[in-house]
């Protein structure tokens, strides 16, 4: 497998943190060119702070972290402290970061990196609202054909919504941004709730993280201890779904995932279904496919990979 050059666009978030750790623990497959923070689970000052905390937890204070957009394109920001806590990384007690944010805006970093790197070599990995990505596409459309692909966490169809009856949080926060990305023509792989709700941290899986006996393993276990309470109370699930790590795991082990290439459109007008990812699973619309919609994962294989990689940190 060729080395994947990626930019992680993120709003940490406990599951974002695990995704970052997985990427930084996998240098044979993944080269992280930089991390851009976006407002989402918590406001931008906290997501930018949390991204640096996680880099230091992984032993990578050299990683370039940039602050991006602090609000959606045209709507007030909606956050998810009720899920992730006031800091966004509630659970473990982690030291404040000592590494500095890079001075450049995250969107400028995305644009400049895609213009500089060889065409077709960079994958964008958005783990939060798509505001930074859409802004980059809008301001510099020349970068779109230079992408390898966009592998994102967002959306839902058969699994329905987690912030409204029909919408997944990342898409709902900035549906106009999602519409720009899905209509851009960029190759898209999406990890919707349909697959991420199958990547559940059961007690034995969380015990395996804790049993690693490392700071990263302990932190992930404590993040999950906090994060899982919402899903257990709301959905009666067996544990916390690791949404965002599915993006990184797909880059390392695509064979763990299955999906279907279909048309996905974003609802931006209806107050009833705002932010819905309208997925033409049965190809009845006649619209051209624009996304690989991932629907299933080998959960045991996923957690084996994740545990093995966290053991490196």
List the predicted regions and their residue ranges.
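Active-site histidine-anchored catalytic micro-motif
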Residues: 2-53, 61, 87, 93-198, ...
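Conformational coupling and interaction surfaces
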Residues: 2-3, 22-25, 29-31, 172-176, ...
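Acidic/polar N-terminal loop/beta-strand segments that form early-domain functional surfaces
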Residues: 37-40, 68-70, 269
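Short, mixed-charge aromatic SLiMs
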Residues: 42-46, 50, 74, 156-160, ...
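Short, conserved catalytic or adaptor-binding loops enriched in Gly and charged residues
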Residues: 55-58, 285
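A short alpha-helix-loop-beta-strand transition element characteristic
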Residues: 59-66
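A residue-level signal for conserved active-site and pocket-lining positions in enzyme catalytic cores
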Residues: 65, 181, 248
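Surface-exposed loop and adjacent secondary-structure segments within mature catalytic domains
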Residues: 66-94
């Amino acid at each position: 497998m060729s080395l994947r050059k990626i930019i992680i666009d993120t709003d940490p978030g406990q599951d974002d943190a695990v995704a970052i750790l997985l990427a930084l623990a996998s240098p044979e497959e993944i080269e992280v060119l930089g991390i851009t923070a976006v407002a989402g689970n918590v406001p931008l000052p906290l997501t930018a702070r949390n991204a640096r905390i996680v880099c230091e937890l992984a032993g990578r204070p050299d990683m370039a972290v940039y602050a991006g957009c602090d609000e959606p394109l045209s709507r007030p920001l909606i956050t998810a402290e009720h899920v992730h806590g006031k800091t966004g990384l509630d659970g473990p007690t982690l030291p404040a970061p000592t590494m500095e944010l890079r001075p450049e805006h995250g969107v400028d970093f995305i644009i400049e990196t895609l213009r500089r790197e060889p065409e077709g070599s960079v994958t964008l990995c958005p783990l939060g609202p798509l505001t930074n990505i859409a802004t980059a596409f809008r301001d510099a459309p020349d970068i779109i054909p230079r992408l390898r692909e966009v592998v994102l966490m967002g959306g839902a169809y058969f699994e329905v919504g987690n912030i409204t009856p029909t919408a997944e949080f990342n898409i709902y926060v900035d549906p106009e941004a999602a519409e720009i990305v899905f209509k851009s023509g960029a190759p898209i792989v999406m990890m919707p709730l349909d697959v991420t709700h199958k990547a559940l941290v059961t007690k034995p899986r969380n015990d395996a993280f804790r049993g690693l006996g490392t700071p990263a393993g302990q932190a992930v276990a404590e993040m999950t201890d906090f994060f899982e309470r919402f899903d257990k109370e709301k959905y009666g699930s067996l544990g916390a779904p690791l949404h965002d790590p599915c993006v990184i795991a797909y880059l390392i082990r695509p064979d763990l995932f299955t999906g279907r290439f279909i048309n996905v459109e974003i609802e931006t007008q209806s107050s009833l279904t705002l932010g819905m990812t309208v997925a033409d699973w049965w190809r009845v619309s006649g619209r051209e496919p624009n996304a690989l919609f991932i629907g299933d994962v080998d959960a045991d294989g996923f957690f084996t990979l994740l545990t093995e990689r966290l053991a490196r940190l």
